[in-house]
C-alpha cells in the first residue's frame, strides 16, 4: 500500500476509486437505441431506463394493409405488406420525416454521452405499419450514425 503512513488518505483514495461516477468515466459510454413496435389498443411501451423520454410515432395515419383480408396473416416484414406500404402506403416519406427527427437526436445523445434513447412506433394492431417502421429505423440508425 503506497500510503501506509497516511491511513486516512489511503482510505479516502480507496473509496474514491469505488465511486460510480468514476466507474462511468472508465467504461466506454455507448448509446443504446431501443426501438419498439406496438398496438395502441395494448398501450405504449414503458421506458424502463429511468429517463422517461424518447419518441412515440403514430403510424395510424398511413394506409393500413390490415384492413385487407389478403394481408391479415402477414407482418410488416413480409414482402406483400412491404410492397403495399412502399407502393400505396406513403411509408417512405413518413420514415424520411422520422429519420430527420431521430438522426440529429442520436448524434446529440452520442456527443453528450447519453446511454439510452427509446423510439416506439404504434399502429392499430402493432403488426404491419409499426413493425415495418421499427425494422427500417433499426436498419437505418447504424448506417447513418457511424
Locations of the language-model features?
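C-terminal accessory "lid"/substrate-recognition subdomains
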Residues: 2-117
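Catalytic cysteine-centered active loop of the rhodanese-like fold, especially the PTP/DSP P-loop
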Residues: 115-138
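A generic structural signal for well-ordered alpha-helical surface patches
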Residues: 96, 100-103, 131-135, 139
Amino acid at each position: 500500500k503506497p500510503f501506509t503512513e497516511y491511513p486516512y488518505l489511503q482510505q479516502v483514495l480507496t473509496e474514491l476509486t469505488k465511486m460510480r461516477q468514476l466507474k462511468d468515466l472508465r467504461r466506454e459510454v455507448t448509446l443504446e437505441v431501443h426501438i419498439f413496435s406496438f398496438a395502441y389498443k395494448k398501450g405504449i411501451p414503458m421506458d424502463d431506463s429511468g429517463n422517461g423520454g424518447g419518441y412515440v410515432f403514430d403510424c395510424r395515419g398511413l394506409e393500413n394493409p390490415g384492413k385487407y383480408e389478403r394481408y391479415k396473416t402477414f407482418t410488416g416484414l413480409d414482402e406483400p405488406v412491404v410492397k403495399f406500404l412502399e407502393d400505396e402506403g406513403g411509408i417512405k416519406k413518413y420514415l424520411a420525416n422520422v429519420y430527420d427527427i431521430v438522426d440529429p437526436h442520436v448524434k446529440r445523445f452520442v456527443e453528450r454521452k447519453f446511454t439510452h434513447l427509446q423510439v416506439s412506433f404504434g399502429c392499430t394492431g402493432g403488426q404491419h405499419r409499426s413493425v415495418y417502421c421499427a425494422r427500417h429505423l433499426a436498419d437505418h440508425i447504424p448506417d447513418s450514425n457511424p
